[in-house]
Amino acid sequence: MANLLADLGQGLAAFHSDLFDNASHLTVVTMSEFGRRAAENGSLGTDHGHGSLMLLMGGHVVGGRVGGSWPGLAAEQLVGPGDLAVTTDYRNVLAEVCLKRLNNPALDEIFPGFPAIPRGFLTSGQ
């Protein structure tokens, strides 16, 4: 996993470097469609779970911080059969991208039935 994260970081850094002055006009979001359970399974891996992570990069990202909280790995802090707790819904992050970077306020059409709450990860602007 550490090697894969290093590869991702190096790839994102190269992408950012290649953009030169245009990097400030771009917002990059990396995310997974699933998280991983905290406990190892019978195959020495981990099953799909709830909690995951997202990375944001770009000129309008309020950087240098972690945008969620860490509830911990104790049994009483896990959800169900060993899932990490979700502390920031991915739709809130993507809703903020829609609002502040795409200038699209139609969040009720993009995320039907979800009351999106921007979390202050981005500044507005082109």
Name what the model sees in each region.
Residues M1-Q126:
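Feature marks hydrolase-like catalytic cores characterized by long aromatic- and Gly/Pro-rich stretches
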